[in-house]
A protein has these predicted regions:
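Bacterial Sec-dependent N-terminal signal peptides
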Residues: 1-22
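Feature for soluble, non-membrane regions of globular proteins
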Residues: 17-212
Length: 212
């Protein structure tokens, strides 16, 4: 009888612990679609390991802890970003932003977009080269930490937006298309204070098939 009781207790305890773990791990660190050294020399292996493996992991852990027991506990990431503020928004925003950022690159990237995106860029800026210059300028002139975005409104009209800290254009009703990270942890190991060089180099690894 005691053995059965202890077995039942262990089962209940383990299920309870599994449930707690499941809640804590609601959001998980995304797997990179390339090796950690695949984007060199544009982004070094060391930067990827710190940026993805440590910085992003911390945001994921923080977010999971912050949303437990709140109305966001079962919400998807975009909903949390749109409806939250404070620490929850900051960490959710950083998780969403980094998920988009890390998956838009490829060691076989570069070149130019094609199709509808290429046409929309030409309509908005006259040429792809003009668009590149404007996005680089936006990223270089953004004061402090943040993100520079190519985004589209509900009619498909493109714009470049600068968002401080964890900002994302979805909070303005826009659809994110492409983003460059201008937090120092994204480039300082490789480019030190040369943010402009970092932004210019990123074009070499943008996977336009993913972006489009």
């Amino acid at each position: 009888m005691i053995t059965i009781f202890l077995s039942l207790f262990a089962l209940i305890f383990n299920n309870s612990e599994a449930s707690k773990t499941e809640k804590v791990m609601k959001f998980e660190l995304i797997q990179l679609p390339y090796a950690s050294d695949a984007l060199e020399p544009v982004i070094s292996k060391q930067t990827i390991e710190f940026h993805h493996g440590k910085h992003l992991q911390t945001y994921v852990n923080n977010l999971n802890n912050l949303i437990q027991g709140t109305k966001f506990e079962n919400a998807d990431l975009e909903t949390i970003v749109k409806e939250s503020d404070g620490a929850v928004f900051n960490n959710a925003g950083q998780v969403l932003n980094h998920n988009l950022y890390f998956t838009e690159f490829s060691p076989k990237g570069g070149g130019k977009p094609t199709g509808k995106l290429a046409k929309a860029i030409d309509e908005a800026w006259g040429s792809f080269e003009n668009f590149q210059k404007e996005l680089e300028t936006a990223g270089t002139t953004l004061f402090g930490s943040g993100w520079v975005w190519l985004a589209a409104d509900k009619d498909g009209k493109l714009s470049i937006t600068k968002e401080s800290n964890a900002g994302n254009p979805i909070t303005k009703g826009l659809k994110p298309i492409l983003t460059f990270d201008v937090w120092e942890h994204a480039y300082y190991l490789d480019y030190q204070n040369r943010r402009a060089d970092h932004l210019k180099a990123l074009w070499k690894i943008v996977d336009w098939q993913v972006v489009e």
